[in-house]
Amino acid sequence: MTRIAYLDCPTGISGDMCLGALLDGGVPLDYLQHHLQGLGIAEEFSLSWHKVEHQGQQASKAEVQLRAHGHHHHPPARHWPDIVALIQQAGLPLRAEAWSLAIFRELALAEAAVHGVAAEQVHFHEVGATDALVDIVGTCLGLDWLGIEELYCSALPTGGGTVKAAHGRLPVPVPAVLQLWQKFHVPVYSNGIERELVTPTGAAIAVTLASQFGPPPPLQLEKIGLGAGTQELPLANILRLWIGQKATQAAVPQGQDGSDRVEEIILLETQIDDLNPQAIGYTMEALFAAGAVDVFTQAIGMKKSRPGVLLSVVCTAETVESCETVLFRETTTLGIRRSQQQRRILARQIQTLDTRYGPIRLKIAYQQGKIVNVQPEFEDCAQVAKQQDLPWQQIHQLALSTWYQHQPSP
């Protein structure tokens, strides 16, 4: 059976909460310490854990104690290439290495988008420090030790307020977290707590490794790991890691196995013939930021023989108002057609594949438990193609062929 895990995050997610949940779930501390030494930064930290209590519930608190560094006593800040080099020379298990590199890549891309620089030029501050390296690599080591093949995650709370960062005070969620949520279309909500609940490290772990966000998948629960956060909150500040076996087809009622599902959507449409084409691209980005599931355009002919654009927006009942607001604000339209439809969705998961040029994520679609489509992620292929100065198509084909080579013969 497939071993899976579910990140239940009622008060958010951070790297140390993930580590605590894994240690609480049975991952040996000495195993993590042994492999983390390979990073070559053992003199910078010590790792330990202990039991704490939040709202009457016991959980495990992972502690990454930083050691003094020179006169200023600050852990070193690092660039993305520095982190890649540390991870690649550490001799980690293959999955742990690939996952760690993928998580830091998403962090670099998010920070690059926020600051308007190339990913290689991103100067990590909080997320590039020693404790984040330990949190991310340690989390990947723990998931690999547990034999987790699929990871799922709950919707994430937004938090609120402000937080002190290297560039001054930032609103919560911080820009890098928002960038990750937007890129991966993460479902979020407010639980009324005005604190930083999701850190950049925690967000990157979730979006990179989780194949789906939402309610827990069908599983036979074997163990729960409870990872404590640092803050005292109105709710028990605990991340709950559900560990178990994926439920078999026979164990799940028909239509609830996640192989495919039907959900209600809303289609918004408007025809435009008097808008600067440059504004269309901006509007599409704004619609995705407002929660649109998909946005697309079609060239059409309109009255008086004018060429125009049919702008279509797929959204949910929860985001329809915000999407309509964007359309009225950013375009010249005077009206929007709204229709309720259904869509059928195949189950899918993201797998990170270790190729000779680096890790590449693939999206795998299932129908009735069988694989029906495999596609490498475009952005991963593009990033590797640029780094290696190779054609995108060559990297795309390499990822597919490498994946198929690792599959068992029928």
UniProtKB/Swiss-Prot annotation:
<dbReference type="InterPro" id="IPR002822">
    <property type="entry name" value="Ni_insertion"/>
</dbReference>
<dbReference type="GO" id="GO:0016151">
    <property type="term" value="F:nickel cation binding"/>
</dbReference>
<comment type="similarity">
    <text>Belongs to the LarC family.</text>
</comment>
<dbReference type="Pfam" id="PF01969">
    <property type="entry name" value="Ni_insertion"/>
</dbReference>
<dbReference type="GO" id="GO:0016829">
    <property type="term" value="F:lyase activity"/>
</dbReference>
<protein>
    <recommendedName>
        <fullName>Putative nickel insertion protein</fullName>
    </recommendedName>
</protein>
<keyword id="KW-0533">Nickel</keyword>
